[in-house]
Amino acid sequence: MTPLLRTICAILCILIAVPLTFACPTKAGVSKQANKRPTYAIAHMVLDRKGLKDAIKNGANSVEIDIAAYKEGWWADHDIRGRSWGDSLEDMFKAVAKESKNIAFVWLDLKTPDMCSGATCNKDVLDPSKCKPKDKCSMNSLQELAQKILNPAGVRILYGFFGAGATDSAGFNYIQGNLKAGEAVCLSGEVENVLNVYKKKGRGVKPQQRVMDYGYTQLETGFGNCKEKGYNTCAGLRNGAKARDKGDVKRVFGWTSRVGDGERVGQLLDKAHVDGIIYGFAITRYYDHEDSRAAARDITQRVQKSDDRYMATGADKPW
């Protein structure tokens, strides 16, 4: 073989070997991301547009909004005593829609008049189950508002029902039978109980639209060591994650992490394998503060150091 032919053969061998040795950068990147779990830092008690901006600035990619019904419509409101009013839900939704690149979903924590009794209660709060479908205080109107503003922006919607009697309400019955695109339902408790409620009362909720949460206002209360069979927060969420991996539920969230909960956050992510954590203050609306920033960093920095997680964006669809 002449030197020229040997040179040509050598070049051809290199050209043939290159694509076999080096994978396509684009596909490799997608594959690497696909093997990681999108993780959600959910800002707790976001009741106004300033709180939303602060949460995003601190690193949140999802927000939990406590809501209550009034004759004028739905409002961000936590304790329905007239002292925790925030912005109208319409204004909140519009603000979230503008941040759709950063916010993956909105968790709507539905409050009811049953939470408040006595002379100090806000008598203007209405029971949405007793509102007519066309009334602004109805569940129908709430869903229409979410579908009108959030769904077109690609922001997912999570209806949360927490507390005694919540799943016996007409509001829950309506939502479980009328879920639309981009919507899911969240029930709180140990996974066996949650699945039992879905089976008996929420048959309209498909497994891919089922979400469960478990926790306590102060995360350290009843947290456990993640090795128990159940009951304790970490073990209960670990059991939920196992059910998720079987396809019984779509997402599993824990709550509420605050400043100083870094070790417990790590356990929820690494041992309980949750999809996300509600963080912030225990009983105060969300705002920018060194404590809320620290609580957010506990999640975001842990995820950044992880080999199998990444912080979700608006492009990630949790359900």
From Swiss-Prot:
The active site is at residue 44. GO terms for biological process: lipid catabolic process. One of its GO terms (cellular component) is extracellular region. The keyword GTP-binding does not apply. Residues 1-23 form the signal peptide. Its cofactor is Mg(2+). Its main location: secreted. It is an enzyme of class 3 (hydrolase). It catalyses: a sphingomyelin + H2O = an N-acylsphing-4-enine 1-phosphate + choline + H(+). Belongs to the sphingomyelinase D/phospholipase D family. It is found in: Secreted. Its EC number is 3.1.4.41. Keywords: Hydrolase, Lipid degradation, Lipid metabolism, Magnesium, Metal-binding, Secreted, Signal, Virulence. Mg(2+) binds at residues 64, 66, 109. Catalyzes the hydrolysis of sphingomyelin. Sphingomyelinases D are produced by some spider in their venoms, but also by arthropods such as ticks, or pathogenic bacteria and fungi. They might play a role in pathogenicity through different mechanisms, such as membrane destabilization and host cell penetration, but also pulmonary inflammation and cutaneous lesions. This is Sphingomyelinase D. A motif (SMD-tail) lies at residues 312-319. The SMD-tail motif is highly conserved and may be responsible for structural stabilization. Binds 1 Mg(2+) ion per subunit. GO terms for molecular function: metal ion binding; sphingomyelin phosphodiesterase D activity.
